[in-house]
């Protein structure tokens, strides 16, 4: 039985200090390709990522979901499993096997890395981020009867499953849209604990400022309401 082709998509915005280490930590025995989406960086993120062996895709219009969608448009036709993570060094790519193996073994189609269930470095997540994960999980349980403890960016999903979800969100609500549409479609989903670190340099686009936190929270709430009332 041949090993499925895995595409790793990394979203990055001004992450020149961290991106090389993130790329180097991706298990090369699992990843068929590594795509870094440069979402409008003004530093050397693209050059550093390319030098580290990743294929760089430019998406100049800001948007977390938009960046990942740009990455999806550029992945290999061979891709069967897609892994998503951030380029700031907070996720642990070396734990990718925890996400990919259950899919390869046919036990599930969608795996979410739960930061709240893993080991979190002090200061890596603010209280409101942890609370938001559990609150959204509570709402998802009420709406769809699914168990969820986090909306973490580090996740893996079968490509054909992802394409059927028809994601549209272009902002920080993108991970939540994926989870909500997967729940509504009764996609086989599981969580696995993953470790989480403080970012390696740069500044957080969400937790780094009050404005960023408020904007992200607002976008997530809008996404929650929009998907909850949609029929398709």
Describe each PLM feature range.
Residues 14-28:
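Short, well-formed alpha-helical segments that are part of the catalytic scaffolds
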Residues 146, 168-170, 180-197:
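Catalytic donor-sugar/metal-binding loop of nucleotide-sugar-dependent glycosyltransferases
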Residues 32-35, 46-74:
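Conserved donor nucleotide-binding strand/loop of the catalytic core
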